[in-house]
């Protein structure tokens, strides 16, 4: 770390017990003491990294004199202490770093310079798919299949962990990156050779903000920005507005942390917090357990903020002690936070914020969210009514007026034989479910009942609204003992009364760390969960990222043949269309406790207040209230089952891995030996033909529209992580390279191969490209007579051969969701030069610039609809060449010429927001910029 210029004489000494530390005291700079907590962390960062060039005295004073009411305008350079990765985004990062080593050498530089300068840590959590479920060996089977599919990727990552310094990998089967981060990796305060400073961390996953609950400033970035940060490049940003979110009151009985976070998500998304920090304050904060704070922080991308910060206090210290952090580290965290004014003191003067919101926690009520956005909160008491209303958008089937619709039969179709078993023999709780029906009480809603014969020979009926997947999944909730213990206890009470999950429900339990398995064992809750089909399925992201695995064949066939609007209920953070399963249309976020309840109900068309879940052994109706665990029961179980020793044991050898990981055959050497036949790992093309000096920026001429899209297009829509559909360009590529269909794996797992990923860009099965009348990865190919429909990738190949650049048109909130750098990489490799939208989500806008694609916005109040653009026009964009002169134009002129010669002209806003971003764009991307700097030095 370069020594700070220390213009304010801020370097001081902190004595903690018998050990002393150097630190940069905020008290040396007048004004710092009044700042919100999150800006104090930024202020310290600038004090410590002041170099007189990129970070100057003026930048530090700008933070200290922050005007809460002003719009962001002052650029600063933020240097995170570490970088966090998961394997889907991490594999392409390591591919890029390996490629950069060769490129630096080609440009005359030293390849050994390509090493992380600050700690970079990866947790492999995105690759496990729930193939096996509802059986005792589900975990073993899923891990076995995971290694078979991903051996090549895992060999590459193990090579990277040895070839690069300052880079560590947590092996598969350990947990989810964000849960492992808060339970083990997070430092809260760093001790770097006796220099103490706040732990700050950016990650290649948008839910990196989970660490905000621990008082750690950080957020998700694209993989390309993370790579630059690893190599010493600071994160360019504007000093943000900070939204103060005041918490008062206490959470009432019967309300979960999930209910609180869904309420906060709805409030903040409605308020508008994109590009802003959110900070929680008020006396209610002290009543929010650390696990709940982490859950709230985790959902920051869903409400759109850069981060969602909680300050450090006694609750933080209690959590660090519980999770097994060394006492010396805990003492440093407390002493440092108090010395820097970063400790939450009750009744201390409130900081000034840019905007204010307030929530009385006592007013929160049980909720779920869906069917396609996390911010679409539904009161549990109104869930049935809202489902019936939303269902109309997913089916044209008529509303049922009575119970007279006969169920269609699916027996013996598609080669399925009653009594036979699949290779994995997946049957929910091993019972046939004779006579069960998801079409019961269907009067008043669309209904299309289908009778399915189970493998055991029993019959049951499915219908619109059937819960096809009930999944306890995701770090968002599995990191929270109160809701996880609650799920186990409701399962216990349900099992005691003879209730079961419905036979058509795929039941999944995939916690975010092995600690959950430990306390479930201690509390003897596994037998109760297993009685309802919730066997341990894996330690990883699973359902939350679409790794739900296939539904049983007979159920999948029935859903697809009869176009049923099946649903999934998950304890995750995202429920975008097409994300959870290709067989499921409607997705709902809920607490783990409600996941159990919906598995028993078997349908979203259910009123938990007034409808019985079933009958007990004596024939008495059993309602949700009869099996809901009390707060006292949950707390008593937590106290008995969870201890510091549990965390210490599970994290003692966290980097060691299982036998399969240890026995992987890995290559040696500092540069990677690329295999041209590999379908997983290919040398990245971004530096091919790169010169020592950047080429001039050019205007865009005669561009065609690749896609015309609506609002809330997610990075899932742009670059799905889901399974690869046979017959698509990605599948055709794998077929041509001898990959069997069952070995396609997911697009997310193949992010180390740009050939697959290019073909998978804009290939989401739910993408609605308004140029065509079909959902999926299609467009019109205007290089052909009449502009016929074609796969997007195939059209792009033709456009490239014809030398025609491309643009994308879209509506509001373009690029929402995951911090998926491949959504920008794929866009670039397909030949897209500009994306024109009404608004962008933060991370994707930054990623586009990082890949040399210019983000543009329609004039305020305008859209492609209001301007009458139908996507058949040719586009000219002029004014970009001003970037060659060192200035960033505020707007550029866009001329869209229709087929009849009519022109539509408008001034698009250039969303290159900082001088640093302009530098990246001039160089063709952030990695090219960093590479040229390395080669030059």
Curated annotation (Swiss-Prot):
Residues 433-444 have a biased composition (Low complexity). Its EC number is 4.2.1.3, 4.2.1.99. Residues 418-429 have a biased composition (Polar residues). The keyword RNA-binding applies. It comes from the Bacteria. Pathway: Carbohydrate metabolism; tricarboxylic acid cycle; isocitrate from oxaloacetate: step 2/2; Organic acid metabolism; propanoate degradation. Involved in the catabolism of short chain fatty acids (SCFA) via the tricarboxylic acid (TCA)(acetyl degradation route) and probably via the 2-methylcitrate cycle I (propionate degradation route). Catalyzes the reversible isomerization of citrate to isocitrate via cis-aconitate. Could catalyze the hydration of 2-methyl-cis-aconitate to yield (2R,3S)-2-methylisocitrate. The apo form of AcnA functions as a RNA-binding regulatory protein. This is Aconitate hydratase A. It comes from Corynebacterium efficiens (strain DSM 44549 / YS-314 / AJ 12310 / JCM 11189 / NBRC 100395).
């Amino acid at each position: 770390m370069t020594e700070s210029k220390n213009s304010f004489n801020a370097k001081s000494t902190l004595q903690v017990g018998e050990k002393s530390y150097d630190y940069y005291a905020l008290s040396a700079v007048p004004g710092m003491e009044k700042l919100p907590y999150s800006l104090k962390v930024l202020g310290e960062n600038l004090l410590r990294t002041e170099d007189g060039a990129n970070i100057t005295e003026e930048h530090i004073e700008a933070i200290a004199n922050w005007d809460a009411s002003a719009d962001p305008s002052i650029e600063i350079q933020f240097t995170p202490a570490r970088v966090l990765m998961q394997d889907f985004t991490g594999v392409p990062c390591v591919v890029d770093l390996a490629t950069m080593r060769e490129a630096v050498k080609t440009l005359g530089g030293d390849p050994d310079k390509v090493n992380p300068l600050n700690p970079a840590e990866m947790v492999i959590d995105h690759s496990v798919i729930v193939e096996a479920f509802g059986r005792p060996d589900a975990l073993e089977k899923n891990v076995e299949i995971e290694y078979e599919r991903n051996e090549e990727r895992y060999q590459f990552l193990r090579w990277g962990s040895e070839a690069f310094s300052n880079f560590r990998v947590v092996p598969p089967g350990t947990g989810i990156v964000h849960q492992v981060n808060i339970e083990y990796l997070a430092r809260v305060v760093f001790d770097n050779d006796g220099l103490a400073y706040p732990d700050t961390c950016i990650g290649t996953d948008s839910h990196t903000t989970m660490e905000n609950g621990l008082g750690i400033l950080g957020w998700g970035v694209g993989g390309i920005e993370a790579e630059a940060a690893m190599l010493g490049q600071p994160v360019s940003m504007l000093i943000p507005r900070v939204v103060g979110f005041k918490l008062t009151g206490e959470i009432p009985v019967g309300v979960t942390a999930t209910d609180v976070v869904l309420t906060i998500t709805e409030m903040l998304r409605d308020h508008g917090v994109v590009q802003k920090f959110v900070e929680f304050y008020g006396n209610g904060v002290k009543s929010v357990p650390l696990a709940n704070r982490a859950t709230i922080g985790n959902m920051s991308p869903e409400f759109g903020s850069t981060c969602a910060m909680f300050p450090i206090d006694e609750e933080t210290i209690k959590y660090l002690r519980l999770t097994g952090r060394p006492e010396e580290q805990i003492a440093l965290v407390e002493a440092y936070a108090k010395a820097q004014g970063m400790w939450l003191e009750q009744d201390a003067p409130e900081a000034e914020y840019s905007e204010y919101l307030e929530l009385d926690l006592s007013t929160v009520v049980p909720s779920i969210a869906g069917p396609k956005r996390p911010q679409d909160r539904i009161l549990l008491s109104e869930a049935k009514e809202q489902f019936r209303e939303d269902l109309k958008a997913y089916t044209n089937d008529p509303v049922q007026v009575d119970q007279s619709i006969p169920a269609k039969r699916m027996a013996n179709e598609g080669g399925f034989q009653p009594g036979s078993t699949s290779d994995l023999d997946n049957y929910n709780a091993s019972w046939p479910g004779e006579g069960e029906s998801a079409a019961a009480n269907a009067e008043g809603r669309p209904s299309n009942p289908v009778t399915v014969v189970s493998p055991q020979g029993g019959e049951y009926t499915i219908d619109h609204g059937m819960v096809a997947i009930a999944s306890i999944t995701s770090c968002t909730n599995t990191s929270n003992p109160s809701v996880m213990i609650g799920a186990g206890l409701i399962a216990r009470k349900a099992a005691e009364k003879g209730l079961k999950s419905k036979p058509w429900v795929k039941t999944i339990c995939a916690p975010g760390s092995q600690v959950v398995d430990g306390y479930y064992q201690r509390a003897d809750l596994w037998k109760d969960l297993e009685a309802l089909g919730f066997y341990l399925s894996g330690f990883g992201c699973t359902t939350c990222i679409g790794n739900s695995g296939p539904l049983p064949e007979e159920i999948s066939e029935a859903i697809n043949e009869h176009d049923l609007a099946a649903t999934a209920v998950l304890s995750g953070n995202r429920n975008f269309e097409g994300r959870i399963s290709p067989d499921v249309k409607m997705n709902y976020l809920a607490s783990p406790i409600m996941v159990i309840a919906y598995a028993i109900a078997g349908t979203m068309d259910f009123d938990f207040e007034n409808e019985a879940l079933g009958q007990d052994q004596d024939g008495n109706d059993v309602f949700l209230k009869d099996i809901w665990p009390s707060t006292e029961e949950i707390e008593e179980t937590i106290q008995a089952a969870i201890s510091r020793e549990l965390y210490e044991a599970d994290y003692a050898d966290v980097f060691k891995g299982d036998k399969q990981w240890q026995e992987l055959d890995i290559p040696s050497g500092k540069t990677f030996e690329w295999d041209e036949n590999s379908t997983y790992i290919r040398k990245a093309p971004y530096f091919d033909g790169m010169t020592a000096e950047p080429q001039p920026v050019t205007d865009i001429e005669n561009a065609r529209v690749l896609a015309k899209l609506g609002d809330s297009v997610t990075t899932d829509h742009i670059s799905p992580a889901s399974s690869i559909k046979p017959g698509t360009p990605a599948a055709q590529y794998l077929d041509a390279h001898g990959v069997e269909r069952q070995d396609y794996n997911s697009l997310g797992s193949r992010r180390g191969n740009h050939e697959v990923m290019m073909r998978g860009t804009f290939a989401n099965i739910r993408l609605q490209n308004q140029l065509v009348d079909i959902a999926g990865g299609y467009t019109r190919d205007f290089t052909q007579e009449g502009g016929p429909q074609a796969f997007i990738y195939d059209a792009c190949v033709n456009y490239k051969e014809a030398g025609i650049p491309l643009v994308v048109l879209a509506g509001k909130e373009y690029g929402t969701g995951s911090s998926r750098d491949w959504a920008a990489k794929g866009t670039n490799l397909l030949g897209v030069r500009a994306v024109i939208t009404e608004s962008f989500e933060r991370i994707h806008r930054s990623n586009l610039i990082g890949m040399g694609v210019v983000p543009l916005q329609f004039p305020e109040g305008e859209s492609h609809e209001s301007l009458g653009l139908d996507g058949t026009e040719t586009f000219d964009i002029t004014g970009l060449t001003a970037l060659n002169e060192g200035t960033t134009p505020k707007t550029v002129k866009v001329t869209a010429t229709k087929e009849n010669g009519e022109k539509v002209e408008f001034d698009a806003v250039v969303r290159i927001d900082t001088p640093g971003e302009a530098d990246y764009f001039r160089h063709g991307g952030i990695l090219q910029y960093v590479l040229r700097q390395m080669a030059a030095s």
